[in-house]
UniProtKB/Swiss-Prot annotation:
Keywords: Disulfide bond, Secreted, Signal. Interacts with NSUN4 isoform 3. Testis and epididymis. Residues 41-169 form the SCP domain. This is Cysteine-rich secretory protein 2. GO terms for biological process: sexual reproduction. InterPro entries: Allrgn_V5/Tpx1_CS, CAP_dom, CAP_sf, Crisp-like_dom, CRISP-related, Cysteine_rich_secretory, SCP_CRISP, ShKT_dom. Residues 1-21 form the signal peptide. The keyword Signal applies. It is found in: Secreted. Belongs to the CRISP family.
Amino acid sequence: MALLPVLFLVTVLLPSLPAEGKDPAFTALLTTQLQVQREIVNKHNELRKAVSPPASNMLKMEWSREVTTNAQRWANKCTLQHSDPEDRKTSTRCGENLYMSSDPTSWSSAIQSWYDEILDFVYGVGPKSPNAVVGHYTQLVWYSTYQVGCGIAYCPNQDSLKYYYVCQYCPAGNNMNRKNTPYQQGTPCAGCPDDCDKGLCTNSCQYQDLLSNCDSLKNTAGCEHELLKEKCKATCLCENKIY
């Protein structure tokens, strides 16, 4: 899986930086708080529902404690770079978006900045220019991703970008084979008519295929084959679900 690009945003400096990041503006962003978790999930679902062109198979996102633990652990390292994909795995591979700021910024603003990369993206074509950064957007709206967990850290070891936001996404998006079409275009919920909640699908799959030809392997070898049991769990175990 390709690493996502990192978004750097320099915001206006506060008159003084807090010791150890204990100021109320920072602690209000900690993702141990239910209201912060709701803000993050609701913002993601609001944006996923609003994609243009509309999506027929966009899953509704939910908060994951396991994913949050991984995201917070990585944020605490204050490296300002992506984690090793192996360190953010759950039952599936997981993606990751990063945001850095010089002062505390709301989660909604950070998430919106990732989505705003849509301005440099054309559905079905890809980035508008070779240097355009769109990987945060495509991960955020990846149709089969349904779990999100985020963490934030204050990083006094950094010169200016001292606030480090990390969101991880499971299953991972940005599959190189279909990165230019992060979802299926169509009427909302057309791909999940019996599992729809306000324009988003709820029939998620907890597994992920590790091979690109699992459908054909299922037809030729069957799901009892050891290879499919290990590498094609979504195809074999998630009938009528989105993966």
